[in-house]
């Protein structure tokens, strides 16, 4: 299935597979929602059935917002934080995966 048209569940599964390949990243479930952490530091976290929040520098966040406005947003509650929200239902799966890899690089210093 094309990641640009994957269901949110398929997108979460793909993120889990990706996270498993990133050195030092572990997946866990809290209150029924997934999160992925690098040695305890947040990489990405599921917000609901169709959205994940991903760690991102402010500069990279701005780039993602301008390049993929259908995929990424910054709700008011994340405006002051180095975080961006990805829409798994309507967004570009490749862009989401790239953002997760960038978050891992940020947290791991790679």
Question: Where is each model-derived feature located?
Answer:
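Charge-dense, helix-prone N-terminal extensions
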Residues: 1-110
């Amino acid at each position: 299935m094309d990641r640009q048209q994957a269901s949110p569940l398929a997108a979460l599964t793909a993120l889990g597979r990706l996270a498993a390949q990133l050195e030092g990243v572990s997946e866990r479930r809290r209150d029924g929602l997934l999160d992925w952490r690098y040695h305890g530091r947040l990489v990405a976290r599921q917000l609901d059935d169709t959205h994940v929040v991903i760690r991102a520098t402010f500069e990279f966040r701005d780039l993602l917002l301008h390049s993929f406005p259908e995929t990424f947003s910054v709700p008011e509650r994340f405006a002051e934080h180095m975080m961006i929200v990805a829409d798994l239902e309507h967004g570009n799966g490749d862009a989401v995966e790239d953002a997760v890899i960038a978050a891992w690089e940020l947290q791991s210093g790679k």
